[in-house]
């Protein structure tokens, strides 16, 4: 029986060494990774726009005059049970930070292809009849096969709140959560890079959604790859997965806690998507993700939990993250 991980790594390694452009996906559990040579992709089944690297040409389709977008979040009582399981593990010292997610049924009069086409997000991917992802979060970039950087995104607030930027940057819980992830990513990059440093710490991005503007907090961690790195991107990416920002720290015990608490399959949600253009490699974390489950649309979203987190605030955050980055969608 073919080992999908081995096949995936061999594909990316070979194409990277040969400088052959490719696009790839890795699911959260790294059980069903997929990779395609760019010149072999059927755009009727796979579409991507990864920070401008795209197989989509031509004008956009028209949207309905009135865009419908309704969400039916999990009941707070159900979320509270998952949250309590996470908190008990945090207090027992089994983790410092856990990214807890939940599935939210949605209804919309847009197709997944419409959402892909019109979403205002730097990293977008559409897989026919399966999912659409419109992510704002970079995972890693590698320039000229030498310089590596990662951009963990941790911390979200409604920009309409009074003094929102200062509020989130001065919040002790948010600060501790972000510091934990930066430390984790710095350690992760040290697995593949010789020298690692924090280039930018806790900078703010504005994200426009269908019903509000959100502020997101990110950091940039940079490093230099060994001189003998020759484009073995399959080996490199698998050493860094899963992404720290969507698991927590430490990773192994935190993934166990996530599995126990969430009780559903993330699938490609919180996995990684990316491309290699023959010279530069770029990837994104698959957050902001809608999945087609037998004709029903499920939006998966999550947030980081620490020992000082409050359930009602975390519950509201996962609801706030269920949005379309399309103006006038309501």
Please name every model-derived segment:
Residues 1-330:
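Extended alpha-helical targeting/anchoring segments
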